[in-house]
């Protein structure tokens, strides 16, 4: 089962107008030629959900936002569970995504879990497979 790869405990760059932390989800369903997080993409992660929740508890009153990034956070089985944990602690949630798991995104949006989405448009259709190593353009 995929886990979280790592946590950046403090950032003022990754979530506009927020003091935030970044939860880096292991794994990705693409293999982009320009990926700068290949270690995250190729990992199964080593941080359990309970450890992430413990971190969130310790950051209440210190942060006002959490960023889910990766890899591809929406491909991870922990995504919705951790999004609910983030919102239950009254943090704003930003999601960095390649947009290929639209049903998961719809569910999260429907539950009011996501406050900000950064959608990474990888390439036009004719270049998509060559750049991403995937056939996910139509899903995007």
Report the location of each language-model feature:
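Conserved AdoMet/S-adenosylmethionine-binding subsite of the radical SAM
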Residues: 55-65, 74-140
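Short, small-residue-rich loop/turn micro-motifs
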Residues: 25-29, 121-123
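Conserved active-site and cofactor/substrate-binding residues in soluble primary-metabolism enzymes
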Residues: 27, 47, 100
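Short aromatic/hydrophobic contact patches that present stacked aromatics
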Residues: 22-24, 67, 94
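N-terminal [4Fe-4S]-dependent radical SAM core
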Residues: 1-24, 31-43, 58-62
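Hydrophobic packing within well-folded, soluble alpha/beta domains
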Residues: 28, 32-35, 86, 95
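Short glycine-centered, acidic/aromatic-flanked micro-motifs in structured strand/loop junctions
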Residues: 70
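Glycine-rich, highly charged phosphate/nucleotide-binding loops
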Residues: 45-55
């Amino acid at each position: 089962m995929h886990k979280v790869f790592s946590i950046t405990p403090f950032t003022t760059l990754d979530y506009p107008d927020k003091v935030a932390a970044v939860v880096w989800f292991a794994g990705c369903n693409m293999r982009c030629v320009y990926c700068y997080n290949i270690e995250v993409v190729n990992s199964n992660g080593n941080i359990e959900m309970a450890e992430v929740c413990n971190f969130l508890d310790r950051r209440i009153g210190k942060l006002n936002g959490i960023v889910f990034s990766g890899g591809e956070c929406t491909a991870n089985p922990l995504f919705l569970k951790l999004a609910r944990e983030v919102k239950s602690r009254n943090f704003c949630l930003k999601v960095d995504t390649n947009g290929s798991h639209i049903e998961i995104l719809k569910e999260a949006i429907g539950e009011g879990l996501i406050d900000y989405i950064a959608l990474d448009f990888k390439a036009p259709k004719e270049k998509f497979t060559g750049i991403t190593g995937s056939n996910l353009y139509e899903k995007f």
